[in-house]
């Protein structure tokens, strides 16, 4: 099992880089328009992107979300990405640490991130199915201690497990196990999806049990069902997802509105198809605390090295900064105060789910500011 887990991590990475692994469905972020202010009454140099985040602080509201680790050949990737996060003062997550729990010799592939980023906000990672199958607070703490993490992500991936040839589609009792982890982990627990999006009901349930940090990881970006179907074809698996691999799930923008409605005081990462600073600005204006990217960071690193990744993330950061400036705010959470228009499919989906877009944009976003450091 240990060798299988490690080998699968390397296979995932190779497929992410070489195959079309993104959903054909949209994030729906294109249905968010931030109203431009032609008389902003602030200078660009006045703008600060610094935020408080899940018990820590970031110089910019960006997260390189976890995707890799657990094989000797990918250690350098975690090291390089972490060094970029350290330089920019942003957060970074590692991929699932299950392989290193099974084989402690692989811990170095994850520990490399902390070695390269002694001051960065570092997020550990374990899968929800492993909690359901027997992992306890002990393994959660092991993952945290392995990399001296500031938080731990518990990732939800029922779709991926259902189509993974060697998957573990076991979720019975998982909510209670997540609640136990949130109470005893010693660091904040971030519950994250993996490309199919969180829902209003799930976030409300978990928030009531003590979880305050979420990553919506919505539909519209990297799709792990599609990745597992592609892997399965090579291995002769009969499992085919059909259109489900492109269109099953909650698009990122819709998932974000649902999560913020369910938990106004939560810290929420919007990931899933975020590819540039406008995507990040739209997501934050819609109520996210931070935007998450993974696939673009890894692909840029593998194609152009560390400097390419640094250039990409600096560009996203600058585009986000100019968006804050062009609405007349000096703090990034000022985007929550900026007038926005939610229209088209996103507005229709919100209404169908019982969320009035006007109430959301004009009332809920402002009320949520009460819970955050906006000085």
From Swiss-Prot:
It comes from Aeropyrum pernix (strain ATCC 700893 / DSM 11879 / JCM 9820 / NBRC 100138 / K1). Involved in the biosynthesis of isoprenoids. Catalyzes the 1,3-allylic rearrangement of the homoallylic substrate isopentenyl (IPP) to its allylic isomer, dimethylallyl diphosphate (DMAPP). It comes from the Archaea. GO terms for biological process: isoprenoid biosynthetic process. The lineage of its organism: Archaea, Thermoproteota, Thermoprotei, Desulfurococcales, Desulfurococcaceae. Substrate binds at residues 8-9, 96-98, 160. InterPro entries: Aldolase_TIM, FMN-dep_DH, IPdP_isomerase. Its EC number is 5.3.3.2. Keywords: Cytoplasm, Flavoprotein, FMN, Isomerase, Isoprene biosynthesis, Magnesium, Metal-binding, NADP. This is Isopentenyl-diphosphate delta-isomerase. Transmembrane segments: none annotated. FMN binds at residues 65-68, 96, 125, 192, 222, 273-275, 294-295.
